[in-house]
């Protein structure tokens, strides 16, 4: 199978998942999409394409990135595929019969994949969040998100000491929801702390659970540091203070005035850098 990220949680770049699916199916592979960063930002079409080769076989996303903290993760998959796989978890509700020497897994879905006591409150929270997103309309959310991301990118590109990671031309590489950056000669952790403590702007910093990708992109801006660390054969150089970025993200509640406040904060930090 082929596993692909729907949207990078580092750069916000949107991958053409249905085109990737067509290519995977051409070579006899299944397509599994990690939509954790995608589900709250972009309309997703798993099936119904005129060319069925563009349909997705499986899609996974996390409720906590879909405005539902404390909610369960979600797996959407073709029943004929998941039915061939032994369930990962065992417990109440996923068996038809239990004997001293073995048990019989039920063929009922989704019961066989939801062993034990379900996260009822989390499921209700997630269902409500998805309902709200559906009422707003994912096409509307993507349009607003795209405008906000483009506006922020254009403003950041006008600040000389700001380094943005990933292609910044949204015509070449569409983006949604996320921009990762660094300020030259400033540690990412310090920038994140200043934004939080002095400007009331919550950002994420470091490697965003994507260490290999972040490391590869940092080669563009931290080549000397990485070379020295590798030359010294330092095994834990990924913990060095320069190893990371700052990530700013947008939600359905953000506006251009939030971007203006963020840009002002960056300029203020840089003006007082010395």
Predicted regions and their residues:
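Pyridoxal 5′-phosphate
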Residues: 1-274
């Amino acid at each position: 199978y082929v596993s692909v990220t729907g949207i990078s949680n580092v750069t916000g770049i949107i991958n053409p998942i249905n085109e990737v699916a067509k290519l995977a199916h051409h070579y006899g592979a299944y397509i599994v999409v990690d939509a954790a960063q995608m589900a709250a930002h972009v309309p997703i079409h798993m099936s119904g394409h005129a060319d069925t080769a563009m349909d997705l076989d499986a899609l996974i996303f996390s409720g906590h990135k879909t405005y539902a903290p404390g909610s369960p993760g979600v797996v959407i998959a073709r029943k004929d595929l998941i039915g061939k796989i032994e369930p990962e978890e065992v417990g109440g509700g996923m068996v038809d019969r239990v004997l001293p020497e073995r048990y019989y897994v039920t063929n009922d879905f989704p019961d066989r994949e939801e062993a034990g006591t379900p996260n009822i409150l989390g499921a209700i929270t997630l269902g409500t969040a998805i309902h709200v997103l559906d009422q707003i309309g994912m096409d509307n959310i993507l349009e607003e998100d795209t405008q906000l991301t483009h506006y922020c990118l254009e403003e950041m590109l006008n600040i000389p000491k700001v380094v943005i990671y990933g292609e910044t031309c949204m015509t070449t590489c569409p983006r949604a929801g996320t921009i990762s950056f660094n300020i030259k000669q400033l540690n990412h952790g310090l920038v994140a702390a200043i934004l939080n403590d002095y400007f009331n702007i919550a950002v994420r910093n470091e490697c965003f659970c994507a260490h290999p990708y972040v490391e590869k992109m940092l080669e563009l801006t931290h080549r000397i540091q990485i070379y020295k660390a590798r030359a010294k054969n330092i095994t834990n150089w990924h913990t060095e203070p320069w190893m990371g970025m700052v990530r700013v993200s947008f939600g359905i509640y953000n506006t251009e005035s939030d971007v203006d406040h963020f840009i002002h904060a960056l300029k203020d930090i840089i003006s007082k850098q010395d």
